[in-house]
Curated annotation (Swiss-Prot):
<dbReference type="InterPro" id="IPR026231">
    <property type="entry name" value="IBD2"/>
</dbReference>
<dbReference type="GO" id="GO:0007094">
    <property type="term" value="P:mitotic spindle assembly checkpoint signaling"/>
</dbReference>
<keyword id="KW-0498">Mitosis</keyword>
<feature type="compositionally biased region" description="Polar residues">
    <location>
        <begin position="250"/>
        <end position="260"/>
    </location>
</feature>
<keyword id="KW-0206">Cytoskeleton</keyword>
<keyword id="KW-0963">Cytoplasm</keyword>
<comment type="similarity">
    <text>Belongs to the IBD2 family.</text>
</comment>
<keyword id="KW-0132">Cell division</keyword>
<dbReference type="GO" id="GO:0051301">
    <property type="term" value="P:cell division"/>
</dbReference>
<feature type="region of interest" description="Disordered">
    <location>
        <begin position="211"/>
        <end position="264"/>
    </location>
</feature>
<protein>
    <recommendedName>
        <fullName>Protein IBD2</fullName>
    </recommendedName>
</protein>
<comment type="function">
    <text>Part of a checkpoint which monitors spindle integrity and prevents premature exit from mitosis.</text>
</comment>
<dbReference type="GO" id="GO:0005737">
    <property type="term" value="C:cytoplasm"/>
</dbReference>
<keyword id="KW-0131">Cell cycle</keyword>
<dbReference type="GO" id="GO:0000922">
    <property type="term" value="C:spindle pole"/>
</dbReference>
Length: 341
């Protein structure tokens, strides 16, 4: 039979499928447990008020009549009264009226958490509040828009940004072959007899003025220079490009090396010793970034904090942005295998 509800209370129906049940068994086992449950958690956890509640047991095929009786809950939480027996043919109905004597003085405004011992399922106040901070900017659902945002964040920390090709795509995507970082060597570059002109080379745009390009007040640690150069450009991040006439070599049996194709983006990771930098192996010193007098690129910041140049990062950057022309994919794979031997 279904569970029925009464005003400000709950009716619980118990059905026996196997014939008559002794009332003393039900009283000792069932009523004891159910009255305790009703006393503590009626109507989905709401505290018991001062009114009475009833529960109903239905026993199928019960032929013996039960006299009206009172049952005192051993827990002392309330009285159980067998009020009546109703017969509807195949089943008899026994109504038990439960009146809670202990909780009459409870304040109706008391929180339900007082009676529940599982804090993980019933959190109160700030403990039950989960805050997701998405920031003040709206994130677009367009995948291209998300990619553009990520590209802007990455580009903001690169020394020279991301070069783009004629269609506006990032050069790192156009030339996105997997990089196999090994020890630094001058890898062979497949020679091309095609003339090189000002414009786009492998997706990188440049102009003739970049031959003498330098960042004023930036990156004092990068390129390996002579003492005169260091005196004259102590705090210049200098990028020197091989002129196009120098990068074009006549046909010969020995292919040119990659150093002939370095452009102004190329970074030397052989940093000069700096007394201000921390010894290698010591804990990072981020205060170096606060006391510096000059703007630093990402690699120099790493060097100042950790005391050594990020060689693998610089190799990756040079591989993608430090050359006017790069080897073909097949040649690159061959050179990678050579350097891994």
């Amino acid at each position: 039979m279904a569970k029925t509800q009464i005003r400000n209370g709950t009716s619980i129906e118990v059905v026996s499928e196997d014939g008559p049940l002794p009332i003393n068994v039900m009283m000792q086992e069932g009523v004891k447990a159910l009255t305790k449950i009703l006393s503590d958690h009626l109507q989905d956890g709401q505290s018991v008020d001062n009114e009475s509640h009833s529960m109903q047991f239905v026993f199928k095929n019960v032929n013996d009549a039960l006299d009206e009786a009172n049952y005192q809950n051993p827990e002392g939480n309330g009285d159980v009264k067998i009020s009546e027996i109703k017969s509807d043919g195949e089943s008899d109905v026994v109504n038990f009226e439960v009146q809670d004597m202990k909780r009459k003085t409870l304040d109706e405004d008391d929180s339900i958490e007082e009676y529940i011992t599982d804090p993980q399922l019933h959190l109160d106040g700030d403990k039950g509040e989960i805050v997701f901070d998405y920031g003040s900017e709206i994130i677009t659902d367009n995948p291209e828009g998300i990619g553009e945002r990520i590209s802007q964040m990455i580009e903001s920390v690169l020394p020279n940004g991301f070069p783009r090709d004629s269609r506006g795509r990032l050069h790192a995507v156009v030339n996105g072959d997997e990089l196999n970082i090994t020890e630094e060597t001058d890898i062979d570059v497949t020679y091309s007899n095609e003339p090189v002109t000002s414009g786009y080379i492998d997706g990188i745009e440049y102009n003739e003025d970049e031959d003498s390009y330098e960042h004023d007040g930036c990156c004092p640690h990068h390129h390996h220079q002579t003492q005169d150069q260091q005196n004259n450009r102590q705090y210049h991040h200098h990028h020197s490009r091989q002129t196009h006439s120098q990068s074009q070599h006549p046909l010969s049996k020995q292919p040119p090396t990659s150093s002939k194709y370095r452009n102004y983006n190329y970074h030397d990771y052989n940093y000069e010793d700096d007394q201000e930098s921390i010894p290698v192996g010591n804990a990072p010193n981020f205060s170096m970034l606060m006391t510096g007098n000059h703007n630093l690129c990402l690699f120099c910041e790493y060097y100042m904090v950790f005391g050594e140049a990020p060689k693998n990062m610089i190799k990756w950057y040079n591989k993608n942005y430090g050359y006017d022309r790069l080897p073909q994919s097949s040649a690159r794979n061959g050179n990678s295998r050579k350097s891994n031997r």
